[in-house]
């Protein structure tokens, strides 16, 4: 009469990874996420490796974690994986200030974001 096991959040041919507290705005992070959506994982890793965006390094680490989860936890074939979904969300926002002229105070917003990457195994057509 114990508690039921939690249902699996992803399908049998999927795996996912999430990275939180990335020090960038969600808008900038989404530019990198759009770059890899729907691509094969080896092509996505190559694109992230040679991207000039600073946040691409962190997105690459998250994608490598999703690939490792697929291989080790779910037994999926790495050569048949694609980036099924990559979505970005807001996280907390640090609020800082800067003294300005005439006794005023300028507000500085330092946003954080999070990314979730889901990879899916697809069978190649012959």
Swiss-Prot record:
Protein name: Large ribosomal subunit protein uL22
Keywords on record: Ribonucleoprotein, Ribosomal protein, RNA-binding, rRNA-binding
The keyword rRNA-binding belongs to this UniProt entry's keyword annotation: yes
Subunit structure: Part of the 50S ribosomal subunit.
Signal peptide region: none
Gene (name only): rplV
InterPro entries: Ribosomal_uL22, Ribosomal_uL22_bac/chlpt-type, Ribosomal_uL22_bac/org-type, Ribosomal_uL22_sf
Record's function text: This protein binds specifically to 23S rRNA; its binding is stimulated by other ribosomal proteins, e.g. L4, L17, and L20. It is important during the early stages of 50S assembly. It makes multiple contacts with different domains of the 23S rRNA in the assembled 50S subunit and ribosome. The globular domain of the protein is located near the polypeptide exit tunnel on the outside of the subunit, while an extended beta-hairpin is found that lines the wall of the exit tunnel in the center of the 70S ribosome.
Provenance organism: Dinoroseobacter shibae (strain DSM 16493 / NCIMB 14021 / DFL 12)
Cystine bridges: none
A single cellular component GO annotation: cytosolic large ribosomal subunit
SUPFAM superfamilies: Ribosomal protein L22
GO BP: any one term: translation
Pfam families membership: Ribosomal_L22
Family statement drawn from the similarity comment of this UniProt entry: Belongs to the universal ribosomal protein uL22 family.
MF GO annotations: rRNA binding; structural constituent of ribosome
